[in-house]
Design a protein with these regions (language model features):
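Intrinsically disordered, low-complexity regions enriched in serine/threonine
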Residues: 12-262
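Charge-rich, low-complexity N-terminal segments
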Residues: 1-10, 15-17
């Protein structure tokens, strides 16, 4: 919280929201030989393998296509990505600043607002590195890029082509895949995007079957809600890059993203 209040001293800061997953139950070292049924409460241990938090700053907000976006800061701590038995020299965290779409609670995160790995030796070290990420974030540029998505539309044929090529993407030979942009969403996410193209109340197709790139982007971030805590930030950033890339490919068939439309 101190890093947030340092950068936004005049803003009302929301109460942190915390989510945990993958509970791990264990025992203290002195109870290794005791059968599980005979363990005393003080001999049992429990921790969560993954934790995520977000902090909203509702006073900094923008509206895109009728959707209110509020500045949001958050991070992830994931033990599953570390060797807990090795000698620790530092702690690792993921950290981001972006916007949350209050219509659907989708997180909108860009590359410059995300640090996939912060290595910190102490809480003060962590705070300093968080402040650096916050200071380098270009909020208005991020908002402008999201606003620009409204200027591009996918036809039903375009959308179907993207869905089909996205399903093929993960089966491409490695050599062919290397020359294409990354797509981190898996088949489960793509299936959700296809379903919500018809069924989502806020971002579905219009009567002609068309969908704006802003709506398409929100279908991607909506599908990302099913991702594990330790992977959803990378996929969220990738969803934004992918949406911008497809937008460009609609008018530039020489774009590396044009493969998804061809």
């Amino acid at each position: 919280m101190s890093a947030v209040t340092t950068l936004f001293p005049n803003e009302a800061i929301g109460t942190p929201e915390i989510r945990v997953s993958h509970q791990i139950k264990g025992r203290t070292p002195d109870a290794l030989h005791i059968p599980t049924k005979d363990l005393q409460d003080f001999q049992r241990t429990s921790y969560f393998e993954r934790m995520a938090f977000i902090i909203k700053i509702p006073g900094i907000a923008e509206t895109i296509n009728g959707n209110r976006l509020e500045l949001t800061i958050g991070g992830v701590r994931a033990y599953n990505q570390e060797n807990l038995y090795s000698k620790k020299a530092y702690e690792k965290f993921k950290f981001f600043i972006g916007f949350q779409n209050m219509v659907c609670c989708n997180l909108c995160v860009s590359t410059d607002g995300f640090q996939s790995e912060i290595r910190a030796m102490s809480s003060l070290d962590l705070e300093a590195k968080m402040i650096q990420v916050l200071a380098n974030y270009r909020a208005q540029e991020h908002l402008n890029s999201m606003q620009n998505l409204l200027e591009h539309n996918l036809t039903e044929r375009d959308f179907a082509q993207i869905i089909g090529k996205s399903r093929l993407y993960n089966f491409l030979p490695k050599k062919e895949k290397l020359v294409l942009p990354d797509l981190l969403l898996n088949d489960g996410h793509i299936n959700t995007v296809a379903k919500d193209y018809y069924q989502d109340e806020s971002f579905c197709r219009n009567a002609n079957g068309d969908i704006s790139m802003w709506e398409f982007y929100n279908l991607l971030t909506g599908s990302n809600k099913t991702s594990y805590i330790d992977t959803f930030l990378e996929r969220g950033v990738n969803a934004f890059d992918f949406s911008k890339g497809i937008s460009k490919a609609l008018s530039d068939r020489n774009s590396i993203y044009s493969w998804f439309l061809s």
